[in-house]
Amino acid sequence: MLKVFETMNKATHHIFQVLTKRPQRLFEMKNDIDWSENIWIGTTVESEKYIYRIKYIEEIPARVKFLSLEPLLGPINNINLNGIDWVIVGGESGFASRPVKKEWIIDIKDMCKVKNIPFFFKQWGGVNRKKAGKELDGKIFTEMPAKSTTRNNKLTTACFLF
């Protein structure tokens, strides 16, 4: 895994969004990794059951830290967004997908607004996610972290399950 991070550090013309459901592994390795500014770190939080993952992200010295609340499977109340630079929310997609409730999304969007954190609403989900769309109250939310606009990089998403 360290070799992957070495490669990302060398490719400074890209921004890598590293998303994991196991942030404790990165936390354990945080001092062994050179956290160059083109490496963003995020974790998936599907419901309140997984809020504990956020504490690991907060302690990793990445330039941009983000949460992917997707698929959002339940309300997430009183989430600690201190040190978080970006929040992505979306419903579950595919066959037998579980529905997301609008009020869950609105609550998270409002929390982001209070903390001045960019909010990105990816999708409503469902069997046909294109048909369901990504409008929320007549708007499309595709906000990005301000830190991302200071560089002229190509955005590359790298997802690792480790």
Where do the protein language model's features map onto the residues?
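Auxiliary Fe-S-binding modules of radical SAM enzymes
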Residues: L73, N78-F162
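Core AdoMet radical
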Residues: M1-M29, I33-G74, D85-V100
